[in-house]
Structure formats: C-alpha cells, structure tokens
Amino acid sequence: MAMGLIRLLSIAFTLVLLSILPLHLSLADEITSIESVPDLQKLMYVAVDGFPCVRLLNLSGEIGCSNPGINKVVAPIIKLKDVKDLVQPHTILVTADEMEDFFTRVSTDLSFASKIGGVLVESGSNFQQKLKGFSPDKRFPQAQFSPYENVEYKWNSAASSIMWRNYNFPVYLLSESGISAVHEILSKKKMKHGTYTSDVAEFNMVMETTKAGTHNSEACLQEGTCLPLGGYSVWSSLPPISVSSSNNRKPVVLTVASMDTASFFRDKSFGADSPISGLVALLGAVDALSRVDGISNLKKQLVFLVLTGETWGYLGSRRFLHELDLHSDAVAGLSNTSIETVLEIGSVGKGLSGGINTFFAHKTRVSSVTNMTLDALKIAQDSLASKNIKILSADTANPGIPPSSLMAFMRKNPQTSAVVLEDFDTNFVNKFYHSHLDDLSNINSSSVVAAASVVARTLYILASDNKDTSNSALGSIHVNASFVEELLTCLLACEPGLSCNLVKDYISPTNTCPGNYAGVILGEPSSKPYLGYVGDVSRFLWNFLADKTSVQKGNTTSVCSKGVCSKTDEVCIKAESNKEGTCVVSTTRYVPAYSTRLKYNDGAWTILPQNSSDSMGMVDPVWTESNWDTLRVHVYTVQHSAYDNAVLVAGITVTTLAYIGILAAKSIITKALKQD
C-alpha cells in the first residue's frame, strides 16, 4: 500500500511538470549533431549575413546608423506590415519597396521612431521590377558644389534623401542567406504558439564615435575615433610623358571617370550605371587605343584620370586640381595650363533604347575648344554608322552640367572647356541612383561598349587633329566587347567578382565581392603609398593603365622582384600576381584623394581653417567614417520573463508538494510498520 502511494505521487508530479513545460520532441532531432558548446551556440544563435548602414560624420553632425549606446541591441522581430501599436522597441523587418516610406515616417514621427530597436531590410533583384524607382540621395546631389545658381533643379527624380539623415538605431541589409535565416526562424513562430517565446535580433553595431561622444568630424578626428573618407585616384598618359624634358610639351586631352559610388549600405554599393559604366567605358577605350600604331606621333597628349571620393564632396577631383597647383610628385609631368580640354564619361549604361544607343553631350560653356570636342563626338558617331549610336547635345534649357566631376573643374576655373557624356538629357534615367539596387542587372553591356567605341575614336580625333572619317587608323580602332563584358562582371558582381582572371592577372585582391564605396584613407597620404592601404580597385586600375599605356625600350623587359625598377621612367606592374613583376616605361601615378580642408601630421588628422580663396573648401562638409569593430547580427529565440517566472513558481510548488508528499508517505509507512 505504501509503495503504491509513492508511485501515484510520482506520476502526479510528472503530469504536473508535463502540463507546465511545453516540451517539443522535435528539438531532439535538431540537436543530434551537437558535440560541443560552439555547436550549441551555432544552433541557438544564428549569425545573419548582410551589409550594415554605418555612422558617417561631417563638420555639422552625423548621418547614417548606429546602436544608440555602447551595448548590443536585442529586440523582437516583427514585419512592418504587422506593426500596429508597439509598446516596446522592436526589430522591424522591412522590404525594399517599403524603405522610403518607412524611413520618411521615422524622421517625422518621433513616437514611432522611439519604438524602433533595429531594422532588417529584405531586398533582391525582384524588387527592381516592382519599384518604379528608389534613390536615397537628394534631388540635386552635392548641389553646394554647383557652378551655377539653380540648385533647386531636379536631376534625380527618384530622390528620397533618406541616406543623408541620422538614425539612432542599427539598420542591416540582409543577404540572400540572411533572408533565409530570418524567414526560417519566423516560420517556426506558429509552431511555437503558446510557448511564451519571442524571435529576436541582436545587433552588435556599436560605433566608436558613439562610445566617445564625438558627434562631428572635428571632434572625432581630435579624439581619433574616425577617419576621413577618401582613397587613391589614378592617372596615366598615353604615350608616357618624359618628366625630365619640359620641351615640346603637347596640349593635354584629359579623359575623366569615377570609381566610387554610395548607397544606404556601406558595402552594398555597386554603382553599376553611376559611375562604373563610365569607368568601364574609359578602360575599354584605353584598351582599344593601346593597340593603335603610331600613338606616339599624335599631336596632343592623351591623359586618363580615374577619381575616387567624388560622391563625398568631389574629393578626388578637388585634390587632383590642388596637387596641380602644388606641382607635387603625384602629378609630375602635368600642369593646369597644359590641359586643353576635358572629356568626362559619366553614366553610360542605360543608353540602349529601341535598338539605338543614345548619349547626350553636356558642355560646360560655349567655346571653340568645346565645339571641337562636340565635332569630334559627331565624327566618331558617323564613323560607327553600323553600330546604331547617336550623340545628341543636351537640352539648352538645362541649368548647366549635371552633377559630375566637371563641377570641381568649373568651380576651380570657370573658363574650363569640357564635355560630360551621359545616358540622360534633362534628368537621370537611372532610377536607382546611389542605391544598392544599381547593380549589374540595371545596365546593358552593349550600351557600355557603344560608349567606349565613341570615346576611343573621339579621343583619337582630338589627339590627331584629323577629322577625316575615312582615315584608316580611325577605322582600325575597335573596342573589345568581350573585354568590356568581363570587366563588368569583375567590378559589379560577386561571382567571379575581383577573383576574375582579368583582375588576378594584375593584383592579388583582398576581397572577392567588389565594393565601390570610397572607404577611408589610411596612413599618411602619398603618391607612392603603402599598397596595403590602397583599395583593390585602385591597385587594379594602376596596374592595368600602366600596362596598357606603357612602352618598352627595345625588345627587352626587366623584372622587379620588390616592386621597384632601376630607371626613373619605369614602373613595376603585376608584382602582386606574379613572384616577379615587370618593369615598363609608363607615366602612371596614384593621387591621394581626401578633403583639401584636412592635413595629416604626426600620425593624426587636423582640420585647416577656411580659406576664402578655396570656394569649394568653404562648403566642404569634410566627411569622416566612425571607427568600429566587427559588425554582427544574430537571430535567436528567447523565453518571456513571465514564462521564466511561471516556471520558477511551478518549480517551487512542485518541490513543496514533493516535500509534503514525502513527509506524508514517511508518516504512513512509519504507522504501517508499527502496526506490523
């Protein structure tokens, strides 16, 4: 009898526990592979791959995103469409087509903003089809640098300006695997109904400027919690310039393109149409011109300039012009006075329409030199009659040139004769300008090939001063379409990305997936920088341009094992990709790109006083990026505190009942033994 009572009590306690604790036997299947604590952590805390929005600063304040304090942010995940009245901060799951309205509401509804713990953004190529347009930039990007007064003009019709605002919470763009991880954990929510659990996102996106309380560029540079935006531009001449000889210097035809772009998310900045299509067109033209016989006999000097930092105050072009004023080593062989005309290649990836590639020539001013460039473009077009290419002059009703590097040239010298070639007339045709959606699928490679073909022949016409369309040399200039297409996949896709054979033939890239955000400038700026401080794309461009514009003395080549050549007019190319590089005669140089308001001294950056003679420096925001450690996001499931309390109470109750039961059983057994 006594043993039966104890058995009944045990069964009763077990039933109580089972009714309180919602055990899911399926969990056992999930953890069969756990062999260590790290395995358990990986199962419980799922690392989410993606791209962060980071904290940027200028002289007047901050933009971008960050954890609000020095600790991690942990908040339950909820889809934006399910948001009603939030009581506590949540992680909002936002789709790309909801971004503009969401961030606009955050900026205008402070009560709503206070309930945002963090944001996960779901995007993908399918959203490009759904969206009519999405550009987080302004209607007139960088209007403060405009050489004309009408800064209210709407160049960017898809503008929302959301990337220029300050958000006091972390924002993270999910990769494809990140989207899958978040959807998987949310899909189990219905299965876990009534289990007192929440699916949360944990953001470890703390910025050093937040920790130190340095909330503008001047303060953070003083405290060393940020670095200036910038990098290294590259220029090269075809043929090489003899720096030692100043005699018989030829007029310079300068061709310009940009290599950097921006988006809401730091490392998801492809900039396919704006500006990488123009960069690839320039490289395609250089490749074509490098195969022309007698290039050394041209009447004018061809110079190619690829700029970085243009998105952040035209850092590259302003610094290049400043170095020309200083006659520094970075621009040895060039001078302001030698530049006769400038041809910039802007956005040229969306020129194809109705089987015809149409481009618009925007000129800085009316002059004989500008007309010469426009005439050369028309002659080049006519020589390519079978290619269905059309060059049109931009609408005279436009207020002036569109946002481009030429603005820096015009502000420096209003008499600059220049033309910028674009795939638009009165406003951007790129509806994803400075957006993470401006990727390879947003452009047409045939449009880029067409632009490269026109540019190559235009440059030959300008440099040779020969307007004869029947010229055999002109007809021999052909752009390699396969080369252009390969280069587009190298610079605008993660597969193969920078691991493509074309890039690896010149450098050993540190990253596979290209990121065309300017980044920060590391160490002391120099025309001969430590290559570990130079980005992959800049290093590739330097090697590629040095190779294509080079000549070799005689038929011999010399090797350079440590990246140094014995002769002053030689440079060492392909030293990264091969054990031994090759010395070639080339005028190819790095030009540091950073604000003219900054000075580097004794390992630190300082901001120089305003100089009234530098009109662009007067309006320069001086952009910096906050230092940060590794940025991580995890998702996992947590129990509600109420549930934890219930389990605690249940445990105490069961323990108490068990104790009482044991005492009762002991008493019954004692009495039974006495009776026996």
From Swiss-Prot:
Subcellular location: Membrane
Membrane association type: Single-pass type I membrane protein
Classification via Pfam families: Ncstrn_small, Nicastrin
Cysteine disulfide links: none
Protein's UniProt keywords contain tRNA processing: no
Positions on the Extracellular side per record topology: 29-644
Glycosylation sites: 58, 336, 371, 444, 480, 555, 611
Cytoplasmic domain ranges by topology: 666-676
UniProt entry keywords in alphabetical sequence: Glycoprotein, Membrane, Notch signaling pathway, Signal, Transmembrane, Transmembrane helix
Gene Ontology terms describing biological process: Notch signaling pathway; protein processing
InterPro entries: Ncstrn_small (IPR041084), Nicastrin (IPR008710)
GO cellular component, as recorded: plasma membrane
Transmembrane feature ranges: 645-665
Key word Chloroplast present: no
Position of the signal peptide: 1-28
Quaternary structure annotation from Swiss-Prot or TrEMBL: Probable component of the gamma-secretase complex, a complex composed of a presenilin homodimer, nicastrin, APH1 and PEN2.
Function (record text): Probable subunit of the gamma-secretase complex, an endoprotease complex that catalyzes the intramembrane cleavage of integral membrane proteins such as Notch.
Family label: Belongs to the nicastrin family.
Protein name: Nicastrin
Annotated organism of origin: Arabidopsis thaliana (Mouse-ear cress)
